[in-house]
Amino acid sequence: MQCMAVHQFAPLLSLLNCSRISSDFGRLFTPKTSTKSRSSTCHPIQCTVVNNTDRRSANYEPSIWSFDYIQSLTSQYKGKSYSSRLNELKKEVKMMEDGTKECLAQLDLIDTLQRLGISYHFEDEINTILKRKYINIQNNINHNYNLYSTALQFRLLRQHGYLVTQEVFNAFKDETGKFKTYLSDDIMGVLSLYEASFYAMKHENVLEEARVFSTECLKEYMMKMEQNKVLLDHDLDHNDNFNVNHHVLIINHALELPLHWRITRSEARWFIDVYEKKQDMDSTLLEFAKLDFNMVQSTHQEDLKHLSRWWRHSKLGEKLNFARDRLMEAFLWEVGLKFEPEFSYFKRISARLFVLITIIDDIYDVYGTLEELELFTKAVERWDVNAINELPEYMKMPFLVLHNTINEMAFDVLGDQNFLNIEYLKKSLVDLCKCYLQEAKWYYSGYQPTLQEYIEMAWLSIGGPVILVHAYFCFTNPITKESMKFFTEGYPNIIQQSCLIVRLADDFGTFSDELNRGDVPKSIQCYMYDTGASEDEAREHIKFLICETWKDMNKNDEDNSCFSETFVEVCKNLARTALFMYQYGDGHASQNCLSKERIFALIINPINFHERK
């Protein structure tokens, strides 16, 4: 299989010229914002005098997560007794898999394992089942699946890299080429079709039609349920009422964000509660999911405490009070990227990068003068610790911490794989700082970029390439010349596309706050300026670009032979985590109630757990 070509901007800029289709794919990023800020942590810009230089301030509030609080986190879910119980449950689930022979039951079990967040324990078994099903499809072995099972099998196979044809859904169309109207009566089948449609690639019109059809059906169902809510509560028996309420809950969740775009850990935390209330839930699966969640959470707490000690030792939070201190939020990004406990090193070191990128972003975006920013950019290009002497005082410490962190990462890769990657890590940082500098020049000159000019810079200035270049070296062994050429020539398409989604999601969630701060125009403003569109129209266009970029990432599944499956999945997880972080506003900078609830649910509070007797 040929490796994918690297075109520095072509895959992204082609989005700007593609023909417009409906972007109504649910309720992504709800509720919609107005131009009024939703954040309680950002205030109008104020200027303070520092060394006779007028500097902007975003007035970010200090972190609410103190060092002492983080260090006090404890979990009972560690040690041999819990590990032994988990292994016992794992054996029971394995027996359940082996004993499930009926095709639909196998698919449902795989889907449940994934949504409960425990499928990573059974990857080999799942791959064996799906490979067998794909071979059956290739051999035209027909199981006469209904809409639900056809869509479920399609989604699971595409998710695992099997390029099943979209034509399987033509069986559910009428003689005019439209999906049969009676399908709307099978609401769970329609939901399954909806989830499958988000694995579409460019020009897959059947899946595009499936998305539009299923979205309309699901919204109509939700409207009907809302109108008939009182009637349903009184006229249905307990079992039917439960099923209806369960369907409403699942459908509403899907319309907010499709399953393909959600991070595993957050979905697991939500679905465990939903699954527990199902009448046909399996108590073994439920106990396994709860125990595994809590045990993994205990490893996350240890990683977080390690990160907190590094942060305190760096003293950056004390010295740079103009910048965001968002250690906890940075770690939450890492939980989205790779939650499994065996990847503690990656979470710990990558979270440092998130923290440092946030600080450097605030230096360029808010605090530094243009002359100072040019000095910092040159220092990063030189990558010489002596360059610190040419920097203003407040820049010296962040430069030194960045320099030491990157060198430490390079040292680790050299020791593990005998490969010196410092030039590649440095290149990603230089690209980042140059983009930051260009955006600062736009700000100081009052320049209004076009959307095309903005995107050329913005997918890099979001900082994602720095994280993903590091991820490549963490999840690639051995490192090959074939794959390294992509980083020599530019960046692989999968990185560009992932980072574009991160940027667009960021813009969508932070637009109102950044508008109040007077920051550089973002994608929404650029589109409004280019076309004369309203804010609502611009938001719809950004949602459309996100959807189209996902189609490009879906297509890359057939072109990623140069990269490990783990690395490709981390790239996609970065995009998913951005959609999670910015779904309801600025989940990175704003310490609002929803952000705190998510952190408590995923990192701090265990799930109520009782071992079966």
UniProtKB/Swiss-Prot annotation:
Transit peptide: 1-46
Pathway: Secondary metabolite biosynthesis; terpenoid biosynthesis
Biological role stated in the UniProt entry: Monoterpene synthase that catalyzes the formation of myrcene. Can use geranyl diphosphate as substrate, but not farnesyl diphosphate or geranylgeranyl diphosphate.
CDD domains to which the protein is assigned, alphabetical: Terpene_cyclase_plant_C1
Keywords per UniProt: Chloroplast, Lyase, Magnesium, Membrane, Metal-binding, Plastid, Transit peptide, Transmembrane, Transmembrane helix
KW Cell division (keyword) present: no
Superkingdom of the organism of origin: Eukaryota
Motif DDXXD motif boundaries: 361-365
Membrane topology per record: Single-pass membrane protein
Enzyme Commission designation: 4.2.3.15
Reactions listed under catalytic activity: (2E)-geranyl diphosphate = beta-myrcene + diphosphate
Signal peptide start and end residues: none
Family to which this protein belongs: Belongs to the terpene synthase family. Tpsb subfamily.
Entry's transmembrane regions: 455-475
Listed cofactors: Mg(2+); Mn(2+)
InterPro entries per the UniProt record, alphabetical: Isoprenoid_synthase_dom_sf, Terpene_cyclase-like_1_C, Terpene_cyclase_plant_C1, Terpene_synth_N, Terpene_synth_N_sf, Terpene_synthase-like, Terpene_synthase_metal-bd, Terpenoid_cyclase/PrenylTrfase
Any GO molecular function: myrcene synthase activity
Subcellular location: Plastid, Chloroplast membrane
Sequence positions that bind (2E)-geranyl diphosphate: R324, D361, D365, R503, D506
This protein's name: Myrcene synthase, chloroplastic
Binding annotation for Mg(2+) 1: D361, D365
Database matches in PANTHER family: OS04G0344100 PROTEIN-RELATED, TERPENE SYNTHASE 10
